[in-house]
Amino acid sequence: MNNYIKALLIIICFSSCSISDKNKYNLDVLEATHLNKNILNRNYVGMTRQQIVYIFGIPIISDSFDDIYHYYLSDSKNNNVYPKKMLNLYFKDNKVFKFNMT
């Protein structure tokens, strides 16, 4: 009888893990809530390409001739997607020298 109770508790514990699966984290989309022009200008201007890829990941579009990386930003709350933004990082001498968000 004691073994049945232990088995039942183990099953309940493992099945409760699937409840937390509703709030998935999407790694493919950067959240724009934490990025504004002051933060970008203060922290990311002057960084190298390798540092940007380490922080933001591989860009969705990279113009090899124009030295521009494009990142897709989205705000989401309660499964509602709010206006989407594009973060464009411009490189000069392998360092970020300007950016814009559209």
From Swiss-Prot:
InterPro entries: BamE, BamE-like, BamE_dom
An individual GO BP term: Gram-negative-bacterium-type cell outer membrane assembly
Cleaved signal peptide residues: 1-20
Major location category of this protein: membrane
Gene Ontology terms, MF aspect: protein-macromolecule adaptor activity
Subunit structure: Part of the Bam complex.
Function: Part of the outer membrane protein assembly complex, which is involved in assembly and insertion of beta-barrel proteins into the outer membrane.
Protein's name according to its UniProt entry: Outer membrane protein assembly factor BamE
Organism: Buchnera aphidicola subsp. Acyrthosiphon pisum (strain APS)
Gene this chain is encoded by: bamE
